[in-house]
Amino acid sequence: MTPSLANFLWSLVAGAVVLGALFGAIIFVSQRDKVRRR
């Protein structure tokens, strides 16, 4: 595995983690909003 390939894979992993956290936060907030509105 070349260093550039390793860096590319790590950037993919970091991007997936950031996207996952973002979607998790959006879903969490939307669930809370639903409860508060009712």
Swiss-Prot record:
Subcellular location: Cellular thylakoid membrane
InterPro entries on file: PSII_PsbX, PSII_PsbX_type_1_subfam
Record's keyword terms, sorted: Membrane, Photosynthesis, Photosystem II, Thylakoid, Transmembrane, Transmembrane helix
Protein name (database record): Photosystem II reaction center protein X
Purpose of the protein: Involved in the binding and/or turnover of quinones at the Q(B) site of photosystem II (PSII). PSII is a light-driven water plastoquinone oxidoreductase, using light energy to abstract electrons from H(2)O, generating a proton gradient subsequently used for ATP formation.
Transmembrane parts of this sequence: 8-28
Main location: membrane
Subunit structure: PSII is composed of 1 copy each of membrane proteins PsbA, PsbB, PsbC, PsbD, PsbE, PsbF, PsbH, PsbI, PsbJ, PsbK, PsbL, PsbM, PsbT, PsbX, PsbY, PsbZ, Psb30/Ycf12, peripheral proteins PsbO, CyanoQ (PsbQ), PsbU, PsbV and a large number of cofactors. It forms dimeric complexes.
Matches recorded under Gene3D superfamilies: Single helix bin
Species assigned in the record: Synechococcus sp. (strain JA-2-3B'a(2-13)) (Cyanobacteria bacterium Yellowstone B-Prime)
Keyword Ribosomal protein among UniProt keywords: no
GO cellular component terms, semicolon-separated: photosystem II; plasma membrane-derived thylakoid membrane
Classification of source organism: Bacteria, Bacillati, Cyanobacteriota, Cyanophyceae, Synechococcales
Pfam families, sorted: PsbX
